[in-house]
């Protein structure tokens, strides 16, 4: 059988069309120099800022500097695996992390890879780590509370869903303890079936010791709080690039809950080390330094991160993302560059003082200079009823206390006010990892403000509170239930509470 030339050509064309090895064009560059986690690359003319590039060894890099004849990229991993002369190819992608409920209960690195030895994460959804913050129209004002379980905070510096409240203080003053207590306190809401009460938590460890992160994870597991928590870890031993991107990755994980009508709480521990990591990257990329050697855009570094926390409008599903950034100060200096930046970005701050901490006032919250600019709108009515006067009374007490150091003879009214102030300070003290339900906090603060503690010796206030709460849980549960359900203290409940407390104080003082 003879084939005509035209038929042969047709057969060849069909066969060629069926071959599955179409060539792909890849844009490739070369590493000119590498060191300190930074690679300088020549030849990637069309690469974009923020794009991911892949080195010969499989390690990924993030392009941050675009220069005339080269590109500066930070290496997200071990820079020993990158050699001078290695080929680098464009991926034409920006950084993405896995998101969704599959991450709950897991410990992941800054890129969303599991590091807890519990296998792969079955997440099908991915999200860019840098997302635009919601606009003004998409938001609504803060109106629902985030209960931290800490009396001093829930009564005096309340936090609302969608708020950004800074926790600031020197090292070893209990900043992380407040954050961990807040996570543990959400367990009660997660035991209920109502989805709108639940707050999912994300804890981001930036530049911390591995032992500290392991300790926190262990504490959360023991408290049964890991079921609704994601831990993102970029420890001190990891590349500065990973410490720099960790908060953005975690924020994207939190935005999944916010944008799907759920509620999330994210803790950045801490943004001082985040700024230091970014300063290191910027200086190595030879960007011009500014104040304290930080680059000029260090304000934008944190503002674009914290602006992503929001309470969404009804049209957008009414979800929320609440942020608790932590800043470590040096010798109580809140006027340094990074602390002032973050104070101006956030909606209030909880200031912890080492002096109070060493005096035994724990949590060591300085009530005088701590504020919550939007949280009071979210505070429940019952708490407003009992805690309205506490801040003023404590301020007056601090003033009188410092004044009384100079004079020994005080008139009875001043002495009574100082004694009352001391008991208020005592009732606001709280053990670590023991958050209180809000209805029990209300009863405790009611006892303090209504002067039921005046006859109780100062050193026995803690014992009084413990016994009183145990008694009320066992025999007067209806009082707690009423406060919890009504969210205010009704006249009937107040009468019951007064009668109970009068009897209890008599019995206790005997």
From Swiss-Prot:
Its main location: membrane. ATP binds at residues 169-176. It is found in: Cell inner membrane. Its EC number is 7.1.2.2. One of its GO terms (cellular component) is plasma membrane. It catalyses: ATP + H2O + 4 H(+)(in) = ADP + phosphate + 5 H(+)(out). GO terms for molecular function: ADP binding; ATP binding; proton-transporting ATP synthase activity, rotational mechanism. Keywords: ATP synthesis, ATP-binding, Cell inner membrane, Cell membrane, CF(1), Hydrogen ion transport, Ion transport, Membrane, Nucleotide-binding, Translocase, Transport. The record marks 370 as: Required for activity. It is an enzyme of class 7 (translocase). It is a peripheral membrane protein. Produces ATP from ADP in the presence of a proton gradient across the membrane. The alpha chain is a regulatory subunit. Belongs to the ATPase alpha/beta chains family. F-type ATPases have 2 components, CF(1) - the catalytic core - and CF(0) - the membrane proton channel. CF(1) has five subunits: alpha(3), beta(3), gamma(1), delta(1), epsilon(1). CF(0) has three main subunits: a(1), b(2) and c(9-12). The alpha and beta chains form an alternating ring which encloses part of the gamma chain. CF(1) is attached to CF(0) by a central stalk formed by the gamma and epsilon chains, while a peripheral stalk is formed by the delta and b chains. PANTHER family: ATP SYNTHASE SUBUNIT ALPHA, MITOCHONDRIAL (PTHR48082:SF2). This is ATP synthase subunit alpha. It comes from Rickettsia felis (strain ATCC VR-1525 / URRWXCal2) (Rickettsia azadi). The gene is atpA.
